[in-house]
């Protein structure tokens, strides 16, 4: 049974919800599942997340927000926050919101009609969480391949301070979960102890085993 708990940690009105256990992602095994389903689906909570992230990008040119992990609602609110400030260099309001498509090899691709939103554009990558930096790195590579320039990587939670050579701005980080751990599946201490995996997790949520 996966039990989601709300930690006594908040940024503005944004709260941190987690489950403790032994979880497996595509790239690692982790001891916390970060639940951001409310922030991704509730407009009020998405706006709260956007308010926390927007100040980092008020003076950064942003043409497109690439929304990974189902964060398009947050991305839309973030665009609104960025263009809404008087100090913003994006005050013309022309920020596009784009979700990636993945091929059979889990590589990001952009169809011909979407490529103009990337090519020669300043792209901000928005993720639900950054645990190892693997997905962030691949996303930066994909944007570069299609001719775009990544101006930042941001997320609700990040276990790393940098990805693809740039700082990751997040609402919550490892200081809020000091015992958060991410392991290569070959070096997972839980597996070595014979502890069963509690759930498989990805950007859509978790599936208990």
Model features per residue range: what roles?
Residues 130-139, 143:
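A phosphate-binding catalytic loop at a beta-strand-loop-alpha-helix junction
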Residues 63, 121, 151:
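Conserved acidic residues
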Residues 60-70:
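Short glycine-rich phosphate-binding loop at a beta-alpha junction
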